[in-house]
Amino acid sequence: MCLLTQTLTLQLGNHTEKNAPSVEGALEIYYFDVGQGDSTLIKQSDDYMLIDAGNNEDGQKIVNYLKDNLHIDNIDYLIGTHSHEDHIGGVDTVIENIDIKNFYLPHETTLEKKSIQDVYKVAKEKNLQITNPQIGSSFQLGEAKCEIVFVDNNEPEEKNNSSIVLKITFGSQTFLFSGDAEYDVESKLDVGKINIYKAGHHGSKSSSTADFIKRIDPDYAIISVGYLMN
């Protein structure tokens, strides 16, 4: 079965707004159609980041697309936003088949569901260290700055609100990926203007409140959602 994607390519070169950092090349973002789930690939220069990997049945489709269509054998950063199956279900398959340099996941000790158990098992087999990122930490993906603007490593009762929220800045353009973070998290975020917003929690009413949307003022929003889901 093929994997449908929606691709966004942002070519800035030196054409950035005044006072914005000068960057070269393009930022490519692949939004994978995994139904009621999330998976996004980001490329800048020769660096790759995969945010989530959909449901269990999506893992092999994502691997096939990465290898066969994009000829990717390694990923610099793999981000599991939180432990729900529709986000990390395919992560174990990705780890089994793609060389991962850095793996970020919120701290969790209960490991109640098989999906997260599988992820920990495969990571251990591959000697892949799991990093529990901290708010304010950042890293570079090529010339794109990636900042952890929220994560809860204290295992909140609502797993959605443990989600890693990632802000990416490329030249003058900003992007926000918020996993399934709900309004309690959104109320704490101070991320400024966002050009392209990956809508939290599949566009459900528990996220993307009117106040939050007003504050980030996105130019575009991307919603990853299953057929006839609302």
For the regions a protein language model found, what residue spans apply to each?
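Non-globular, low-confidence helical/coil segments that flank catalytic cores
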Residues: 2-230
